[in-house]
C-alpha cells in the first residue's frame, strides 16, 4: 500500500507536539501512594530572592546530598525545559505515612571556598525551592547577624506532610539548626519527617499558595468596574457622535446629489466622501502589513483560548503547564495567521504570497527566539538554570518548521481562495488623490501617539497584577478578571481607532490602514513605559542577567500585545469604513 503524501511530516509533527504534553511516570504523577511507598523530595533551584528568574541548580551551592540511591529526572514538558526547572534528587529517604526522626543525612566539609560560596548566597538572600508530589516548598539558605560579620547556615529541614487518604495534600518546611560558618569545619545536615492527617481535599491543596487578599482586593474590583464604566461611556459617546455626525454627512451628501453639476462645482465639498476613490487603495508595504494583521489575529486567538483553558483547568498546579499550553495553542492556531494575513494580502493585490506566508509564520517566533537567544548567552555565562538546553532549541525549531509553517500554509491557501477577492464598495482611482494640509493634531503621527492612551488606561491596573504574578512570588489565578479585561481592551481599542479613523478621513486623508493599526498598537509603548516604572519602583531587581531578562521579555510581551491590539483596531475600523462607504451613493 502506498503511503499518504506528507505522512512522515505529519508523524514528525505529532511526535513533536507530544513533547508539550506531560508524561505519566510512577505514582508521583498519579498522586496516589501506598503505605511505606517512596515519596521523592526533588531539589529544584536556588537564587537571589529579589531576582526571581535568576536561578541556579540547587547543588551549584556546596550542599551535600543524601545517601539514598540517585534518581534521574528529565524535563517532562517543553514548558519545564524553557522555564529552567532543574529537579535533582535530594537523596533523602521519605516513605508515605512513615515518620522519620531527626537525623543526619550528610556532612559538609566546609573549606574556605565553600564558605565563601555560602556567604555570597546569604548576602544576596538566596532561597531555594523543592518539590514533593508536585507541591512547591521554599526555604532560605541562611542568615547574617545584625552586624553582618558572622553568617549562619540552616542545617535542619523539618518537614510536615499532610495526607488525605492515599494522597499528599499539604507540605510545610521549617528551617532550624542555625550553624555559624567557620572555615575548615564539618557541618552536619539533618532532616525529619512528620506525617499528619488532613481534611484538605486533593483538589484544594494548592489553595494555600493563592493570595485572595491580593488578587481580589477592592482596588482590583474597583479597577474592573472603572474600566467597565469607561467602556459603556466610550461606546455610548462614540455611537452618539458618529450617528449624529454621519447622519448629517449623509444628509449633506444626499443634498449635493440633488444639485446640478454647476451648483456642485460651486459648492464647498469636503469630508470623508471626497476620498472614496482612494480609501480602499492598498496600504503601503502590504506584505509587512498583512503579516502583522495575521500575526495579531493569531495572538488574539491564542490569548482567548489559553485564558478559557486556564479558567477551566488549574494550569498553575503543574510545572510549566501554562507555557506548554500556550506553545501548543500557538502552533495549533497557525491557520488563523495564514487565513487572515493571506486573504488580506490577496485583496490588496499582492503577488508574492509565499514570501508573505513565510514572514507571517515566522514573525512572532523569530522575535521570541531572537530575544531568548540573546538572553541565553547571558544565562550560559552566569551558569543559570534558565539557559535553554540545545535539545530544547532543536525541538522549538522543529515545531516552527514542521508544525507552524505547514499549518500557516494551509490557512494562507484557504484565505486566498475563500476571501481573497477584492469586493470594495467603491472603485479605486488610477491616480492617487493629493492629501490636503490639515491641522497638526490631525496628522497620522499625532493620532498614533494618542491612540493608545485610553486602551492602556483600561488595562494598566491589571498589568500590575500580571507583572506581580510573573516577576514576584504570586500565583495568578483570577483568569475571569483577565477575560473581562481582554474584552474591555478589545472594545476600547475598536472604539478609539474608529474615532481616529473618522477624523482622519474627514480631513481627506485616506492613509487609514497603517494609522488604525499603529494607533491601536501604540498601547504597547505605554505598557513598556509602565514596565520601567514597575522595575524601578515596585521591585528590587539587580544584576545584568535579571535586568536583561526583565526588559528583554517585557519588550517581547509589549510588542506582541501591540500587534494584537493593532490587528483588533484594524479589523474593527475596516468594518466601519466599509459600512459608511456602502451606505453613501457614489457616482
Swiss-Prot record:
InterPro entries: EMP70. Residues 1-26 form the signal peptide. It is found in: Membrane. The keyword Lipid biosynthesis does not apply. The keyword Ion transport does not apply. Keywords: Glycoprotein, Membrane, Signal, Transmembrane, Transmembrane helix. This is Transmembrane 9 superfamily member 3. The lineage of its organism: Eukaryota, Metazoa, Chordata, Craniata, Vertebrata. The gene is Tm9sf3.
